[in-house]
Amino acid sequence: MAPRCWHWWRWSAWSGLRPSPSRSTPTPGFCQKFSTQEKTPQICVVGSGPAGFYTAQHLLKHHTHAHVDIYEKQLVPFGLVRFGVAPDHPEVKNVINTFTQTARSDRCAFQGNVVVGRDVSVPELREAYHAVVLSYGAEDHQPLGIPGEELPGVVSARAFVGWYNGLPENQELAPDLSCDTAVILGQGNVALDVARILLTPPEHLEKTDITEAALGALRQSRVKTVWIVGRRGPLQVAFTIKELREMIQLPGTRPILDPSDFLGLQDRIKDVPRPRRRLTELLLRTATEKPGVEEAARQALASRAWGLRFFRSPQQVLPTPDGQRVAGIRLAVTSLEGVGESTRAVPTGDVEDLPCGLLLSSVGYKSRPIDPSVPFDPKLGVIPNTEGRVVNVPGLYCSGWVKRGPTGVITTTMTDSFLTSQALLEDLKAGLLPSGPRPGYVAIQALLSNRGVRPVSFSDWEKLDAEEVSRGQGTGKPREKLVDRREMLRLLGH
């Protein structure tokens, strides 16, 4: 049900008056001229990861009077840039500098520690703002859907990444690293991140922002071999060449690739797009060419190894004899049917058991519904939308992974978010959003206060940021992340 003040606005009018779909990329120099009644739009963005900040950035840049409030359930901003990017990839986190400039704008406000859907509903936000953009990402992981995945020792890659990156809800994970073999199901960049962190000499991580608890556990790790398993073949891997090259060059490790997995690929890659061709050529060289003298010597001294297993689909998690934890994974051997993007893996009838003491599932993230009033496609794991406009809910938009699914890199999300914000500005200019003033955060602040919720501001975050940087200086780290919500609130005097 739409809020009371929206009853006058029929969907038929929305769909009939809505501008034609915008171009597939933001127009260079895109700028809008707005009438007097449109000069102070109050806009709400839910989520402070890349999608949320890029949406806010574009809105503020292209509407000189818009005010944007960014709501975030965590106490701290930046989403997966803080909690998802690997600690040994600090250059990727430089985008935080841009987001900080956006948050410091006098027309932007960060409201952390607010759970939309619990502390405040989406209909309440829609009553308070001219437009609401949902940019809350994909915080769940795809289940394996096989027997035994509930066994101790089976961990989602998402939780493992959150553990070493300081996500508060993952700090009790305590992964058991006392085994010698780990298996990762999935062959995307997250899988390679996890494998790299497991195998990187701990001294190489000491000057990163990995949490001290995770670093301590990795120092005690006995994991020597990591298998990265995929249902399809080398031509279908989802990781990129940068991450593969890092694995091949990882100190103290050697790759294990089966040359038979690459038979006939040399001829088949001639017509594939250049990025895929370069990636496959690197795999081919690593699997089939004899290493040079220097590389052979390096590999001979390696105490750890990693390997790619292709054409294997998980069937069952195998328990220890006492049934108390994981002992291995049963894999169905597959073959490929179809061509191009429609290629799919089908079981051949053969199976093999791969022993391991740690099993990490990296088969994808998924979004969750945020509020009963918001349409959600559980199969696709996205909010149904047309170019960011939520279907049948005027004034409600979405951007990022909850809009298109959990794919792409940060620049993909940037383009996607710019398109959503451009659609919103077009609708505002066309008179399709509510006219007249809206209270914005003033109304929401009163609701939150009555419900005992104390938001965290961006200046509060900057105090926490300074504390983290200070704690890291003693050990030569860029920061030592605060991982306890209660400690963070205590430091802020909440």
Curated annotation (Swiss-Prot):
Membrane topology: Peripheral membrane protein
Chain sites annotated for binding FAD: 51, 72, 80, 116, 401, 408-410
Transit peptide: 1-34
Positions that bind NADP(+): 187-190, 231-232, 243, 408
Tissue-wise expression: Expressed in the adrenal, testis and ovary and to a lesser extent in the liver and kidney.
GO biological process: cholesterol metabolic process; ubiquinone biosynthetic process
A single cellular component GO annotation: mitochondrial inner membrane
Reaction equations catalysed: 2 reduced [adrenodoxin] + NADP(+) + H(+) = 2 oxidized [adrenodoxin] + NADPH; 2 reduced [2Fe-2S]-[ferredoxin] + NADP(+) + H(+) = 2 oxidized [2Fe-2S]-[ferredoxin] + NADPH
Chain positions found as Phosphoserine: 313
Record bears the keyword Lipid metabolism: yes
Cofactor(s) required, per the database record: FAD
Pathway this chain belongs to: Steroid metabolism; cholesterol metabolism
EC numbers: 1.18.1.6
GO molecular function: ferredoxin-NADP+ reductase activity; NADPH binding
Keywords: Cholesterol metabolism, Electron transport, FAD, Flavoprotein, Lipid metabolism, Membrane, Mitochondrion, Mitochondrion inner membrane, NADP, Oxidoreductase, Phosphoprotein, Steroid metabolism, Sterol metabolism, Transit peptide, Transport
Record has Electron transport as a keyword: yes
Origin superkingdom: Eukaryota
Any single Pfam family the record assigns to this protein: Pyr_redox_2
Record's subcellular location: Mitochondrion inner membrane
Similarity-based family: Belongs to the ferredoxin--NADP reductase type 1 family.
Subunit details: Monomer. Interacts directly with FDX1.
Role description: Also acts as a ferredoxin--NADP(+) reductase essential for coenzyme Q biosynthesis: together with FDX2, transfers the electrons required for the hydroxylation reaction performed by COQ6.
Name of protein: NADPH:adrenodoxin oxidoreductase, mitochondrial
Organismal lineage: Eukaryota, Metazoa, Chordata, Craniata, Vertebrata
